[in-house]
Amino acid sequence: AMGISGQPKALVDLAELAKDTEKGRKLTGRSQVDTRTRAFACYGIGMVAYRSADIDVKTQAFDALKSVMEEANNERNIKVAAINGLSLMNLQSDNASEKEKKLTVDVLACLDKFFDSKAGRGTDLIKSHVPPSIAKLIGRGDSKLHQKYKNDYLKALFPKKKSGNDLYRAAAIALGQLAQAQSELKTDKKYSDGLKKYFENGKDAQARYFALLALGQIGGNENKTYLMKVLSKGNKALERPWAAISLGVMDFLRFEKDKKSAGIDVTLGKLLVKQLKDVKNPEARAAFAVALGLCRYTDAAADIMNMLMKYKSQDELAGYLCIGLSLMNYQPAKTDIHNVVKESVRRPELLKQAAIALGKLGDKTVTTTLTGMLQEKESNLAKLSAIASALGFIGDRRTIQPLKKMLFDDNLTPLSRAFAAVALGGVADKEKLPWNSKIARNMNYRGSVETLTQSG
């Protein structure tokens, strides 16, 4: 919470907690600051740095995280948190001041030092967070610095000696954020070629799929043609779904880049619909539905709606079908998705996905349904969490008063009141996406540690 607030004055206490100092121990009232608190303090430091435009605040945040990185202790939760905290420095690549340029150099040097250290294969999981963090810091480009890292990560895909699988995954993710399409920069063709080569010949399945996704993020007609070939002829259960998501991301980025004149890609839409109908695997179908949503191919809406009615007992598939409809902004789906929400009282994941889909479609009436569910005498933690998350995502200001009333209602269960507070926090958040989306975006989520992927 101290980090989410973005208040620079919180940095002092967050740094003491992260470094497990005497003052930090006094703040916790314990003989030492526990691992979980230290890790979240590191994330908090990164959040403060992200929100501040003051280079001195960013430098103060860096100094604290650098101290954690230089500790001999390699407790993975703490190191992973510090690395991802450093990725949130939010430094300007254009028109940067001399102080900001120096800080960028210092942050990169800190990350490089850890990545290049000879610490044994046991640290591969921790190190795998460095390439995506560096990519997040410097973004896509063609400077000498960008070329250095792109070459480094291309080599990391094909090392002379076998690396840990997490490092292959990290390299693929980073290249997807750093490289440019061949049409934009001819010399970057080798990075897309390297990703294709790894997909075709690489040994780690997850790194192969990340390579496909990276091609979509890089973009360009050559990569699109390649991905459409995989979508048509690849393995049905895994390769085709990853190619579909990659193509969906590519199309979404095209719409974002050219908001006024970008048209619907009918050829891609038809190919995705064919996969949706032909491939029977539920997880694959979920991916195709989301991809169709990202492509805004509303001609597929009727097929997705029919599938939702047929398979609404399959929570994961039904949830993603709802998301797909919302991504393509198919307004006629509101009523049916609202009914899914009402019928999903004991199915928290479907409830959450369907409610978020309605929020994306602009249906504010669902908040009345959700606040009503939150007031029920309920001890199902997953359900309450799903409701609170959905209310926070939708962000309807009209829910503030009923949620405040619930917060102070002694007749409700303590859990209901607690999650009313959680929902209020989400509604009040001035940003469109949840606070942790900055950390989650384009990271190696397969290199997971407890404090990164578990909220409890």
Language-model region placement:
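Long, helix-rich interaction regions
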Residues: 1-456
